[in-house]
Amino acid sequence: RIAERIRTERLSILAIPTSLEIRMTCAQLGIPVTSLFSHKPDWTFDGADEVDSHFNLIKGRGGAMFKEKLLISSSPQTYILVDPSKKVERLGAKFPIPIEIFPEALTYVEDRLQRLNPGEIKLRMGQGKDGPIITENGNMILDVWMDYIPENTESTLKSITGVLESGLFMNYKVEVLGLTS
């Protein structure tokens, strides 16, 4: 609908894509793009893999959680659009926490993560290609299942040397839309 409004109503916007896939989609739809180098966002909208009753999120199945977190942190207002199936009683119920790591830190990070007593840690592997998924930042992704995610988990993960970012979004100021059918 945004692309249609740009064409029909001469709506003037610039999108700041968080991935090459979104950048390509914007190009196909005729939505002009920019970057955080050039513009500060007025607002952000995105989706989520899971959302709890406190509007904490798990994001990152697409592997762009570093750029997503950077954009959300840079925005005065963030809207998260989800359908009711994304609502969970506790984060981690349906999806693991994705963690973007520097490749050479893999063994070290896995060792440090084991101290958090996760249910499972898996290196995200490519489908239709050999080897692990490599993010646009040149890093790998560990998917970490946890039965319980304490409030300090995001900062604990971020404090591990070799972790660039996680897909855990705790206590961000977001407005979640679409939870009711």
Model-derived segments and spans:
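Glycine-rich N-terminal segment of FAD-binding domains in flavoprotein oxidoreductases
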Residues: 1-6
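Short active-site oxyanion
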Residues: 9-15, 56
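Catalytic nucleophile loop
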Residues: 15-21
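Conserved phosphate- and dinucleotide-binding cores of soluble alpha/beta proteins
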Residues: 21-181
